[in-house]
């Protein structure tokens, strides 16, 4: 899983330099016709710089970016259905105080069957070369924004951006009012909305569902939970599953003890729980007004409790959570007392923190653009945040390379200065558990991690066995099945082939010499025959003229030739028929004294002759 994050206060859609980013997502071919303007349903961006009410619902206990990513991944990786992506829609508020659902986080797995071509719709083509260049351009601009202004090379986005990947990326710009769209209906009614089939998607009345059908989606399901709505989509038609609905409602319930994940089976990499420092312990999450005097919120770290997440390999990790946090949304926030603070931490359409370089998302990678800013709004004093920032700069980021060659970044930001002692212990634990650098062979081309000697030896033996299998297939007679006998039989077979080649070459040379001798003998006979008394032979023999009769019936022709038997007239007739591309069905020959009579029945093929044309052609070739 690859985790992409930005600074929590960076807004990609409202800065002056990046104001065209929203248009980049929404101005592709026919996108404007399939998604109505955002003002009709939801509010996704703002350009106001004055202090505004807080837009995000206060973070609930146990809700943070790391566990949300793991929950989304475990949801679709742990099922036998072929889900393509999973998105968590997080409730928040617009400037009017109305509740809306916005992008919380997402996980893109990709299509199950990579051997088959990508599913495409018969609607207007979204995968033309021009559209592909446009998608790559938008993705490169997004990469440069996320990587802090460093423009990535063109090789970073060299593959095609598939329709499902583009649909997943464009989903970051979506938001839903309560009761609008599939996610809004699921959040308003509390019931799952399951739409399967391209016809049902186009007739669902939701523009996003129609767009998903255009991009090859066949199933979109929105399942409400206590803290938001989980949307899963697939390129295959999948029937409604009550097990998946129950799993979502348990897995994404962050309130109190209902969110305990110890009994769930997370179908993840077994080493991921041990290698990823972000899974060992999570920082406590602050709530609005938790540090203000008189609000009755305890500040002692003893009021925190931890929940255990059980993985398949038996390793566990803890998530620190405050049970006294109030999950109730609060549209009016005390941050309005400080305009500078509000401008820094007000949520518009922000991305989460990361310093990693972004590339095109592949199958099985988490594309994290969720909002992970853990904020403490109760203390308007900027000095506390500057101190917190200095502490965070001293913390080490842990970068772990899992066994499946997926790069994972773990970076935590604290929400309260009261828990600095807890954070310090976390930093020490991360530093102690850092994996040592492996010593082994240098990585080959395209390999991210060098192989150790055990893996290299295993691959060498597999390659050697494959070659022995190929050798056994070409050797005809194998005495025994062991490798030594196989090599001996192969050597004997090769020597036998060599002897056959030598013998064949000698026979070829012998036949060539015999042919030369026959040619010399024929030349001598012709010379002796021509040196005789030609006048006496000509006077004694009466020349016989040549007569050719031809009859054509449809595609067949009957040929009768009367000529002298000298100079092989039968061979000349057959040669003429071959040159004229005539197929011989029947032929006969008889000799009376010096007269030879030939009869042949032939069939015309590609060339069609008349009776006169065929007779003239035969006379020119035989006579």
Curated annotation (Swiss-Prot):
Compartmental location: Nucleus
Keyword entries, A-Z: Abscisic acid signaling pathway, Activator, DNA-binding, Host-virus interaction, Jasmonic acid signaling pathway, Nucleus, Phosphoprotein, Transcription, Transcription regulation
Activity regulation as described: Down-regulated by KIN10 that controls its protein stability under a phosphorylation-dependent manner.
Domain bHLH, chain residue ranges per copy: 448-497
GO cellular component assignments: nucleus
Motif Nuclear localization signal location, chain numbering: 434-442
Biased composition (Low complexity): 299-308
Residue numbers spanned by region Disordered: 111-133, 265-399
GO MF annotations in UniProt: DNA binding; DNA-binding transcription factor activity; kinase binding; protein dimerization activity; sequence-specific DNA binding; transcription cis-regulatory region binding
Residues forming coiled coils: none
Tissue expression from the record: Widely expressed in the whole plant with the highest expression in stem. Constitutively expressed in dark- and light-grown seedlings.
Gene Ontology terms: biological process: abscisic acid-activated signaling pathway; extracellular ATP signaling; indole glucosinolate biosynthetic process; L-tryptophan metabolic process; positive regulation of DNA-templated transcription; positive regulation of flavonoid biosynthetic process; protein homotetramerization; regulation of defense response to insect
Inducing stimuli: Detected early after abscisic acid (ABA) treatment or after dehydration and high-salt stresses. Induced by UV treatment. Up-regulated by methyl jasmonate and herbivory.
Complex formation: Homotetramer. Tetramerization enhances DNA binding affinity. Interacts (via N-terminus) with RGA, (via TAD domain) with the mediator subunit MED25, with TIC, MYC3, AFPH2/NINJA and the JAZ repressors TIFY10A/JAZ1, TIFY10B/JAZ2, TIFY6B/JAZ3, TIFY6A/JAZ4, TIFY11A/JAZ5, TIFY11B/JAZ6, TIFY5A/JAZ8, TIFY7/JAZ9, TIFY9/JAZ10, TIFY3A/JAZ11 and TIFY3B/JAZ12. Interacts with JAZ13 (via jas motif). Interacts with MYB28, MYB29, MYB34, MYB51, MYB76, MYB122 and mybe MYB2. Interacts with PYL6 in the nucleus. Interaction with PYL6 is increased in the presence of abscisic acid. Interacts with KIN10. (Microbial infection) Interacts with tomato spotted wilt virus (TSWV). This interaction prevents activation of Jasmonate signaling, thereby facilitating viral uptake by insects vectors.
Name recorded for this polypeptide: Transcription factor MYC2
Source species of the chain: Arabidopsis thaliana (Mouse-ear cress)
């Amino acid at each position: 899983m690859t985790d992409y994050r930005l600074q929590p206060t960076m807004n990609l859609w409202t800065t002056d330099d990046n104001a065209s980013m929203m248009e980049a997502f929404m101005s592709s071919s026919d996108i404007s016709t399939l998604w109505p303007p955002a003002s009709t349903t939801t509010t996704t961006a703002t350009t106001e710089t004055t202090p505004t009410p807080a837009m995000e619902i206060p973070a609930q206990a146990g809700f943070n970016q790391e566990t949300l990513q793991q929950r989304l991944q475990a949801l679709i990786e742990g099922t036998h259905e072929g889900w393509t992506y999973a998105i968590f829609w997080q409730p928040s508020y617009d400037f009017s105080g109305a509740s809306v659902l916005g992008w919380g986080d997402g996980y893109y797995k990709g299509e199950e069957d990579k051997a088959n071509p990508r599913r495409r719709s018969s609607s207007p083509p979204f995968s033309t070369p021009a559209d592909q260049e446009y998608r790559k351009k938008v993705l490169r601009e997004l990469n440069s924004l996320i990587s802090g202004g460093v423009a990535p090379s063109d090789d970073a986005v060299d593959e095609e951006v598939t329709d499902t990947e583009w649909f997943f990326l464009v989903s970051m710009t979506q938001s839903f009012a309560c009761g609008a769209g599939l996610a809004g209906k699921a959040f308003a009614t509390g019931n799952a909305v399951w739409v399967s089939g391209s016809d049902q998607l186009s007739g669902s009345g939701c523009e996003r569902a129609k767009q998903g059908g255009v991009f090859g989606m066949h199933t979109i399901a929105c399942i409400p939970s206590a803290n938001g709505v989980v949307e899963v989509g697939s390129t295959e038609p999948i029937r409604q599953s009550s097990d998946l609905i129950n799993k979502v409602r348990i897995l994404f319930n962050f309130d109190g003890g209902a969110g305990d994940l110890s009994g769930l089976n997370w179908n993840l990499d077994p080493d991921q729980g041990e290698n990823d420092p972000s899974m060992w312990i999570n920082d406590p999450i602050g709530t609005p007004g938790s540090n203000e005097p008189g609000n009755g919120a305890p500040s002692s770290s003893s009021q925190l409790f931890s929940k255990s997440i059980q993985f398949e390999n038996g390793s566990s990790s803890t998530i620190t959570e405050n049970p006294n946090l109030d999950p109730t949304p609060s549209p009016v926030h005390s941050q309005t007392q400080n305009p500078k603070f509000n401008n820094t931490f007000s949520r518009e359409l922000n991305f989460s923190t990361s310093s990693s370089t972004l590339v095109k998302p592949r199958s099985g990678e988490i594309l994290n653009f969720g909002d992970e800013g853990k904020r403490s709004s109760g203390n308007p004093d900027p000095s506390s945040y500057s101190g917190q920032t200095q502490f965070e700069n001293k913390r080490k980021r842990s970068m772990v390379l899992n066994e499946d060659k997926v790069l994972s970044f773990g970076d935590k930001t604290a929400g309260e200065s009261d828990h600095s002692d807890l954070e310090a212990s976390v930093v020490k634990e991360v530093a102690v558990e850092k994996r040592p650098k492996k010593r082994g062979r240098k990585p080959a081309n395209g390999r991210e991690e060098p192989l150790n000697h055990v893996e290299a030896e295993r691959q060498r033996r597999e390659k050697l066995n494959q070659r022995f299998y190929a050798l056994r297939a070409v050797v005809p007679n194998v005495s025994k099945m062991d490798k030594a006998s196989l090599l001996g039989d192969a050597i004997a077979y090769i020597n036998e082939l060599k002897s056959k080649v030598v013998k064949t070459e000698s026979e070829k040379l012998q036949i060539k010499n015999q042919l030369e001798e026959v040619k010399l003998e024929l030349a001598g006979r012709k010379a002796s025959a021509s040196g005789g008394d030609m006048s006496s032979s000509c006077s004694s023999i009466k020349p016989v003229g040549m007569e050719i009769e031809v009859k054509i019936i449809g595609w067949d022709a009957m040929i009768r030739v009367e000529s002298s038997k000298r100079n092989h007239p039968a061979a000349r007739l057959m040669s003429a028929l071959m040159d004229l591309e005539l197929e011989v069905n029947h032929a006969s020959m008889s000799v009376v004294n010096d007269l030879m009579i030939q009869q042949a029945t032939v069939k015309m093929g590609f060339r069609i002759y008349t009776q006169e044309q065929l007779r003239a052609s035969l006379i020119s070739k035989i006579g």
